[in-house]
C-alpha cells in the first residue's frame, strides 16, 4: 500500500510539472524524468532536433532495459511502457519520422492501465490522441479525428492540479474547428458529459486564452445547473456528494475565474449556489465556486446585497469554509487533493480583499499571507521542486534553477510569489532578512518559461531589491547578464545601473550611462511608451543631480529649462492627464509636482535673497498641483524653506502636518531634528539652567504672551524642549526599525548619534558608524526613482 501511494504521489507530481520523483520504483522515476525532459524541449517555441531526439531515445532504451531487468508487477510495468511509448511517438513525430510515430503511438494506445491510475491514464490518452490526430494530412482531418475520439478519452473534468491534462486540452481545443459554439457542441456530444462540453467550449483557439463572456451561453449553463441541482438529493451518511454536481463545480471554477467579468453575473447564480449548498455536505468544490460567484456578483454596487446579505462578506465566509474543508481533507489523507486550487484561492482573496475585510475569529488578512507562504513551501518540498532558500537566493546567477511547469501552474506559482513580494516590499525586516530576495528568486525561474515581459520585470525587481540592500555589485551583474544583454533598450534597467554606479566615489560612469541613455531615448522619442516617458523625465532629473554633484548648483540651475521643455514635449497636447497601465497609475500632475519640488530644492542649495524668492515661486507651483490622494507631499520641503527664512514656527506646523499624514515621513522627521538641534545650538546654556525648573500657570501665560511677540520661539522652556527631543528620538528609532528609507538614510543615523551623544549612551558610536557607512553607499537619487 505504501509503494502504491508513493507511485500515485509521483504521478501527481508529474501532472503538476515536477522533474524529480521518489516513487520507490527507479524505472518509473526515470521514465517520468524522460517525460519531463521531453516536455521541456517541446514547450513554448522549442523544438526537438535530431541530436536531442537521439539522446532521448537512448534514455528511453535505458529505462526499458531497467524495467526488464528487475521484476515489476504488471500494472506498474504497463504504466511505464505507456509513458515511454507516448514519449517515443512524440519524438518520432517531432523529428519528422511519421510512420514510426504512428506505430509507437498505437502501441501505447493499446496498453490498458489499471483503474488505480485513471487520472494519469486520461492525461496519457489525451496526449496520445493529440499527436495521433496531428499525423492526419490537413487541419480538417485533424479536427474530425479529435471530435470523433475526444470523449472516448476525456471522461471527467480535471482538477486545477491536473495541469498537464489541462495543457493537453488547450492543445486539442486549438485544433478543433468551431469548438466554441456551445449550442452545436451540445448537439454533437452526449448529455452525461455536459460539464466537459462546457469546459471545451470556453477554451479559445489561442493557447492561454479563454473565450469572451456570452450572455446566451451563461443562461444556457445556468439552466443546466439549476436543472441538475433540482434533481439531486442531500447525500446519506454512507454516500458522497453528487458526482455530476461536483464535476459541474469544477467547470464553474474555471468559468467564473476566467470568463465572467465583474458585474456581469446574473443574481440567479446566487440562488444556484444556495441550492447547491443545501444538497451537499461540506463540499470543497461548492465552497470554492461560491467564493468566486459571490465576489463577482457582489462587485456590482446594486447587487452588493441580496436579501440583506452582503455578498463580499459572504464570499469571504465561503473562503473560510473552503480552507476548513481542505484542512480536514489534509488531516485524513496527509495531502491536499487539489493544491493548485488552494493557491489560486489564496491569491484571489489576498489581491481582492484587504485588512478592512477581516472577520473576528474567522478571517485574518495577515494570517492568510502567512498561510500562503507555508502552502508554497509545502508544495515545493512535497513535490521535490527546487526551492530558493534565503542563503541560496542571494545570487540567481550563481544558483540558476530550471523549471518547466504547465502554464496554469506556472501562472499560479509566479502570482503567489509576486503577491508575497508586493505585500512585503516596503517591509524593512523582509528586506534585511532576505525574504524579498527569496520571493523573487523563486519567481524568476518560473517567469523565464512564461512571458518575457514578466521575466524582465521580475529580474528588475530582484536587482532593485539588491540595490536597496546596497549590494550594488551583484545588482549590476544581474542587470547586465539577465536584462541588458537580451534587451538593450530596457531604459529602467540602465537607470538602475546608473544609480548603482552613483554610490561609488567616482560618479563619471553613472553620468556617462545616463547621458548615453538619454540620447538614445531622444532619438526614439516617437516610439516611447507612456511608462518610458516617465522614465525619461526621472532619468533627466538624475542627470541634473549628477551635474550638481560633479559641477555645482549654479551649472545645474542653468539646465532647468531643459527639464521643463522635455516635460512639455513628452506630455503636453495629450488628452489623458492620468494613464492607467499594467504597472499602476501614472499621474502627470504628480510628475510635474516632482519637477517643481526638485527645482525648489535646487534654489534652496544657495539661499540668496533672489534664490529664496525663486524657491518660493517653485513651491507655489508645486502646491497648486496638490490632490487629495497624494496630499502633503510638499510639506517637508516647505518646512525646510521656512527654516531658511527663519520662520521656525511655521516650519514646525508643516512638519506636524506631514507627520500626522505619515508618521514615517523621513524628510519631515529630519526637518524636525534640524529645528530641535538648531534651537539647542543657539541656547545650549539657557537650556541647561532651566531644564529642571517648574513653570507656574502665570509663567506659562507670560511665556505665551512673549511668544506672540516672538513668532519663532518654539518651546516654552527646557522641559518642553526635552519632551520634543524625546519625541524626535521615538520617531528616529521607529524610522530605523520600520522604514527602508529611514534605515538607509545617513542623516537619520546622524540625528540619532547627536541624541545619544547628548545623553552619553553607548549607542553613539554605532549610530555614527551607520551614518558613515550609508553615506558612502548613498546613491545620487532614491533607487525607487527608476521603478516606473
From Swiss-Prot:
GO BP, sorted A to Z: protein localization to plasma membrane; protein targeting to vacuole; receptor-mediated endocytosis
Lipid bilayer topology: Peripheral membrane protein
Subcellular location: Cytoplasmic granule; Cell membrane
GO CC entries: actin cortical patch; cytosol; endosome; plasma membrane
Keyword terms of this UniProt record: Cell membrane, Endocytosis, Membrane
InterPro entries: Endocytosis_PI4K-reg_protein, TPR-like_helical_dom_sf
SUPFAM superfamilies: TPR-like (SSF48452)
Family according to the record: Belongs to the YPP1 family.
Function: Involved in endocytosis.
Listed name of the protein: Cargo-transport protein YPP1
Amino acid at each position: 500500500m505504501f509503494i502504491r501511494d508513493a507511485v500515485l504521489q509521483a504521478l501527481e507530481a508529474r501532472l503538476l510539472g515536477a522533474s524529480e520523483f521518489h516513487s520507490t520504483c527507479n524505472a518509473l522515476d526515470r521514465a517520468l524524468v524522460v517525460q519531463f525532459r521531453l516536455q521541456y524541449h517541446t514547450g513554448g517555441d522549442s523544438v526537438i532536433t535530431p541530436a536531442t531526439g537521439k539522446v532521448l531515445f537512448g534514455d528511453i532504451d535505458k529505462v526499458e532495459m531497467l524495467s526488464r531487468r528487475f521484476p515489476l508487477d504488471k500494472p506498474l510495468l504497463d504504466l511505464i511502457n505507456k509513458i515511454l511509448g507516448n514519449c517515443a511517438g512524440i519524438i518520432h513525430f517531432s523529428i519528422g519520422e511519421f510512420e514510426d510515430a504512428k506505430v509507437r503511438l498505437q502501441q501505447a494506445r493499446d496498453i490498458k492501465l489499471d483503474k488505480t491510475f485513471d487520472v494519469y491514464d486520461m492525461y496519457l490518452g489525451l496526449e496520445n490522441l493529440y499527436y495521433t490526430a496531428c499525423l492526419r494530412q490537413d487541419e480538417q482531418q485533424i479536427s474530425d479525428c479529435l471530435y470523433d475520439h475526444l470523449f472516448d478519452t476525456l471522461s471527467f473534468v480535471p482538477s486545477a492540479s491536473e495541469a498537464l491534462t489541462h495543457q493537453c486540452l488547450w492543445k486539442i481545443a486549438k485544433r478543433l474547428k468551431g469548438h466554441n459554439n456551445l449550442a452545436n457542441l451540445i448537439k454533437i456530444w452526449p448529455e452525461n458529459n455536459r460539464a466537459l462540453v462546457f469546459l471545451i467550449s470556453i477554451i479559445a483557439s489561442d493557447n492561454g486564452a479563454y473565450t469572451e463572456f456570452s450572455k446566451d451561453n451563461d443562461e444556457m449553463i445556468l439552466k443546466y445547473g439549476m436543472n441538475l441541482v433540482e434533481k439531486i438529493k442531500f447525500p446519506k451518511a454512507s454516500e458522497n456528494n453528487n458526482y455530476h454536481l461536483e464535476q459541474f463545480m469544477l467547470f464553474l471554477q474555471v468559468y467564473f475565474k476566467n470568463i465572467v467579468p465583474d458585474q456581469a453575473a446574473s443574481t440567479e447564480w446566487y440562488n444556484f449556489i444556495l441550492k447547491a449548498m443545501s444538497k451537499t455536505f461540506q463540499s470543497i468544490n461548492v465552497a470554492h465556486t461560491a467564493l468566486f460567484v459571490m465576489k463577482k456578483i457582489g462587485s456590482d454596487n446594486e447587487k452588493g446585497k441580496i436579501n440583506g446579505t452582503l455578498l463580499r462578506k459572504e464570499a469571504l465566509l465561503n473562503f473560510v469554509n473552503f480552507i476548513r474543508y481542505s484542512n480536514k481533507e489534509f488531516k485524513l489523507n496527509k495531502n491536499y487533493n487539489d493544491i493548485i486550487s488552494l493557491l489560486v484561492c489564496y491569491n484571489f482573496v489576498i489581491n481582492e480583499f484587504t485588512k478592512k475585510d477581516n472577520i473576528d475569529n474567522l478571517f485574518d488578512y495577515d494570517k492568510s499571507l502567512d498561510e500562503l507562504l507555508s502552502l508554497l513551501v509545502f508544495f515545493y518540498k512535497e513535490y521535490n521542486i527546487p526551492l530558493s532558500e534565503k542563503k541560496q537566493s542571494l545570487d540567481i546567477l550563481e544558483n540558476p534553477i530550471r523549471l518547466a511547469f504547465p502554464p496554469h501552474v506556472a501562472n499560479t506559482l509566479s502570482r503567489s510569489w509576486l503577491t508575497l513580494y508586493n505585500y512585503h516590499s516596503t517591509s524593512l525586516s523582509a528586506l534585511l532578512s532576505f525574504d524579498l530576495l527569496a520571493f523573487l528568486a523563486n519567481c524568476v525561474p518560473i517567469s523565464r518559461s512564461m512571458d518575457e515581459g514578466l521575466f524582465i520585470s521580475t529580474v528588475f525587481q530582484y536587482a532593485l531589491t539588491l540595490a536597496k540592500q546596497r549590494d550594488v555589485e551583484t545588482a549590476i551583474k544581474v542587470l547586465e547578464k539577465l536584462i541588458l544583454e537580451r534587451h538593450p533598450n530596457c531604459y529602467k534597467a540602465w537607470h538602475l545601473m546608473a544609480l548603482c554606479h552613483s554610490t561609488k566615489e567616482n560618479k563619471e560612469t553613472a553620468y556617462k550611462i545616463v547621458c548615453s541613455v538619454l540620447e538614445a531615448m531622444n532619438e526614439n522619442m516617437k516610439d516611447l511608451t507612456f511608462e518610458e516617458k516617465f522614465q525619461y523625465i526621472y532619468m533627466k532629473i538624475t542627470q541634473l543631480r549628477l551635474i550638481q554633484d560633479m559641477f555645482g548648483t549654479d551649472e545645474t540651475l542653468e539646465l532647468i529649462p531643459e527639464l521643463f521643455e522635455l516635460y512639455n514635449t513628452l506630455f503636453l497636447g495629450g488628452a489623458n492627464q492620468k494613464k492607467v497601465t499594467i504597472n499602476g497609475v501614472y499621474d502627470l500632475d504628480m510628475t510635474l509636482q516632482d519637477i517643481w519640488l526638485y527645482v525648489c530644492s535646487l534654489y534652496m542649495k544657495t539661499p540668496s535673497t533672489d534664490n529664496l524668492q525663486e524657491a518660493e515661486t517653485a513651491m507655489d507651483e508645486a502646491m497648486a498641483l496638490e490632490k487629495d490622494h497624494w496630499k502633503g507631499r510638499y510639506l517637508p520641503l516647505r518646512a525646510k524653506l521656512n527654516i531658511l527664512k527663519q520662520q521656525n514656527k511655521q516650519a514646525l506646523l508643516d512638519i506636524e502636518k506631514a507627520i500626522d499624514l505619515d508618521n514615517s515621513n523621513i524628510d519631515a522627521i529630519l526637518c524636525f531634528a534640524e529645528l530641535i538641534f538648531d534651537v539647542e545650538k543657539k541656547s545650549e546654556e539657557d537650556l541647561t539652567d532651566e531644564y529642571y525648573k517648574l513653570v507656574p500657570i502665570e509663567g506659562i501665560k507670560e511665556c505665551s504672551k512673549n511668544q506672540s511677540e516672538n513668532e519663532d520661539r518654539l518651546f516654552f522652556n527646557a522641559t518642553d524642549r526635552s519632551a520634543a527631543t524625546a519625541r524626535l528620538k521615538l520617531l528616529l528609532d521607529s524610522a530605523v526599525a520600520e522604514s527602508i528609507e529611514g534605515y538607509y538614510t545617513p542623516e537619520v543615523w546622524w540625528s540619532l548619534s547627536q541624541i545619544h551623544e547628548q545623553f552619553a549612551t553607548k549607542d553613539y558610536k554605532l549610530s555614527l558608524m551607520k551614518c558613515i557607512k550609508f553615506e558612502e553607499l548613498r546613491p545620487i537619487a532614491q533607487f525607487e526613482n527608476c521603478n516606473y
